[in-house]
Amino acid sequence: VKTYLENDELNEKYPVYPFALRSQDGNATLTGQINYPETPAGVYPLVMLAPGSGMHDRHYLIGDSGTQADFVFSCLAQDFLAAGLAVLRFDCRGVKGNLRDNTLDSPEYLFNRELAYRQMFIDAAVRQTVTPQSQYEDLYTLYRYASELPHIDRHNLILLGHSEGTINIGRMVARYPVAAKALMLVSPVFSSMKHVLEWQLIHRTIAWLKAIPHTGDRLTLEDLKNGFGRSPLAFLQPISSLLPYKGYWDEADFDSMTARLQASFDTQRDMVLSHDDREPWPADAPFTQSSYAWWKQWYQNDQPEIEHLARCQSRVVCYFGMMDTQLNAAAEAAWFEGVKHRFPHIDITLLPDVGHTLGLHGLLGPMTESCAELLVRTAHDIVTAR
């Protein structure tokens, strides 16, 4: 198994240049770092890493293995650096650390680690300024900074986004003059934010129950037991929450489940949309993650995100994990087939047996070695191509 350098060791091996930039809206200081493959001399291609939803620092802790490989961006950075690319990583605004910080190992935080983390490492007032606009503006501030650095080859920049990071990259390139050589989008949203949330809250459980192998129009308890482990459902909820107490699920059950979930979604949507954009979501400090403006877009924005890439001058390389629990990857890919004549610059790759972070888990990392290798090889080919 490949071993990765600890976050500090990485900076000892690959020269690190920290930065602190004022955000465009003046509400935040954007912190992060660039590592170079060696002491910089001449210019280097650069890959800039943009994380998905949530409150992340530059290391992007999104794995569940308890190892260094859980820091998905630290590990990708190491692989890119070894391949000769410089790497920019940043902290989301208002985030000053991650849940594995050893300050939190103190016995007093044994039962409230999460709360202590929020109080020590999250600036709730700054998080309340997170909006759809701030997300892509911050990316542009970072992109502009990187493209003007003396040791960065501005004609050889790759923007790599994961999940919501792909949305923010798309929105940025649609609005600003961005001359990236390529966009690499991992688990991108081609459809709309609202479509994704409806899939998660209404349709996915039933779609995946129906996909479990069974005969006729009944899914029996036996079918469920036999097929559950191979279904993405296994990553979402225990089998005990899906037991058919009459011995089977049938079409009428699925219909009433859907109706119930749809009604619950509608109620939730009305509640969410009744809040002012500037209010803290989901609650006041220390629980603030963003403004309500950020959360509301998931209930009302039905513009297909792929449209932001329509006039993009860069090559766009996309990766979907077919065991993804967050996106309906097969449907996103099928939908792309219908519009791809308008997007000749976009390529998609479907990866079997991996999830949202291209790992074994349906949602979380670590990323598999073969997927990480694929990303690094692709990036290397892009920046070395004439």
Please give the residue ranges for each predicted region.
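Alpha/beta-hydrolase fold nucleophile elbow
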Residues: 152-163
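Conserved alpha/beta-hydrolase
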Residues: 70-100, 108, 112-119
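Catalytic active-site module of serine/aspartate enzymes centered on a nucleophile-bearing elbow/loop
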Residues: 347, 352-386
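Short beta-strand/loop motif that positions the catalytic acidic residue
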Residues: 312, 318-320
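N-terminal cap/lid segment of alpha/beta-hydrolase-fold proteins
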Residues: 2-42
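Conserved alpha/beta-hydrolase "acid-adjacent" motif
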Residues: 325-331
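Short, surface-exposed "cap/lid" segments of acyl-processing enzymes
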Residues: 39-80
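Accessory cap/linker subdomain of secreted extracellular hydrolases
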Residues: 101-125, 129-132, 136, 186-308
